[in-house]
Amino acid sequence: LKRLLWQLYRMPGRQNRQLEQRCSQLYAAWGIPQGDVNAGYLSCAVGIACSTSQKLAIRKEILQAVSEQFDTSVAAVESGIRRMVDQLEEKPTPAWLAFKADTRLGSGKPTTGKLIYAVRDVVLRQKSP
C-alpha cells in the first residue's frame, strides 16, 4: 500500500505539480523558506494523503512512506514536521494564524496528523488555474 501510494503521488502530471505548487505557496505565506527539508516532508505526506479518500494511519502508512522516499527514519520525518510547527508557533505569521483558524486547528500546536490533513483540505479546496 505504501509503495502504491507513493507511486500515485509521484505520477507525473499536472495535478501533482499543482499540489506541490499549492503547498509551496502556502508555506511561503507562513514564512517557511523554499527548499526547507521539513516542508518537503510535509508536502510528501500531504500528497500521500491526497492520493486516497480513506483515512490513513499517520506513522505506519504516511510517515513510513515519506521516510522511505527521503531515505531516513519515521522518527526523523515526524521530528522534522514538529520542528517546523515549533518554528511557526514561536513566531506566528498572520497567514499561519489564519490557516489555523480556517482549519479549526485551535490555538495550540497541531499534531502532525491534524496538520497533514488540514493542509490537504486547504490545497484540495483551492481552484485550479
Identify the residue ranges that each predicted region occupies.
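C-terminal engagement/docking regions of AAA+ P-loop ATPases
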Residues: 59-62, 68-70, 79-82, 89-129
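C-terminal output/effector regions of signal-responsive regulators
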Residues: 16-72, 81, 85, 89
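Receiver (REC) domain switch/output surface
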Residues: 1-12
